Amino acid sequence: ACNAERSAISTRTLLQLAALSRQHFEAMQERVQGDWDFSTTGKLVLYPTQAGVDAARHQLDVQSKLGSAPQRIVTAAEAVALEPALAAYQPQFAGAVHTPSECAADCYKVSQQLEAWLRQQGVKFVMGTKVQSLRREGGSNGKIVAVQTSQGDITADHFMVALGVDSVALCKPLGVNVPVYPLKGYSLTLDVSQAGNKAPSVSITDSSRKVVFARIGERLRVAGMVELVGHDLSIPKDKIQSLCASTEAVFPGCSDFAEVQPWAGLRPATPTAVPIAEKAGASNRWLNTGHGALGFTLAFGTA
């Protein structure tokens, strides 16, 4: 998964999936007409050294040949012109990659409003129910006939397993190996409604701090870190303090951090970074998992 040839294949696949996902997301927006703090203000990836900028330029050349969205290298001064909230941080980075087409939205609101719309179309959602196992008929490749749940069996013609890292445990008793591992990450959400030009409107990735900042309406979402800790979802205080410190360093004065909404999640990662969207063993069982940190980016392309 890590050699140059395999990496190029994975990059091409991810770029194609991302483009397809964007198309389907835009089509969904036209149909659902929701309000989920959607914005298309672009993204800047900051690099602390000129060597980092040069390496990014090489990667852009590779991605361009594979069909990526338009991107360009900008100087630190040009980055500040695009996002004035970076002015105080300008001495800390040498340049950046600018992707004008990048968008942001509140994934939770998207999910809520898409669910409401689907209910109107006649889709049934079963909430508050624990999925226990998949019941099949015949041998190892036998068809799945039901999902066994805490509320009884649910039968269907086809079954899609889209449980993130929990897809592994559900499929294991059926002899299906799902190569997904949880990579733990943290985020916090801040109210920046009174921040003025101290808070960014452009999405920012600071490659030196390994932290991303996304403006979602009047809030700023700050996320980062990768930990290999199994399925632990605890939120140690020092992790959130670290994200707060990074926020104050990059965007001083954008928040008083009086109300911080912390969160921890498990990114379902595959060895190649490419999600798994395919049949799994039985003719009527499908997998849709392994999106890693690109869940929103790829979701509509793998649905």
Descriptions of predicted regions:
Residues 1, 87, 131-136, 140-144, ...:
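Active-site substrate-recognition segment that forms the wall
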Residues 1-76:
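Dinucleotide-binding Rossmann-like beta1-alpha1 core, especially the glycine-rich loop
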Residues 9-22, 47-55, 96-116, 234-242:
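Short beta-strand to alpha-helix junction loop
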Residues 27-38, 68, 121-124, 176, ...:
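Surface-exposed helix-capping loop/turn segments at secondary-structure junctions
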Residues 54-66, 86-158:
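Helical element adjacent to the flavin cofactor pocket in flavoenzyme catalytic cores
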Residues 72-74, 124-126, 260:
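General small-molecule cofactor/ligand-binding pocket signal
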Residues 122-124, 220, 285:
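Short, conserved active-site loop motifs that form the nucleotide-linked donor/cofactor pocket
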Residues 231-237, 286-302:
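A conserved FAD-binding loop/helix module that cradles the flavin
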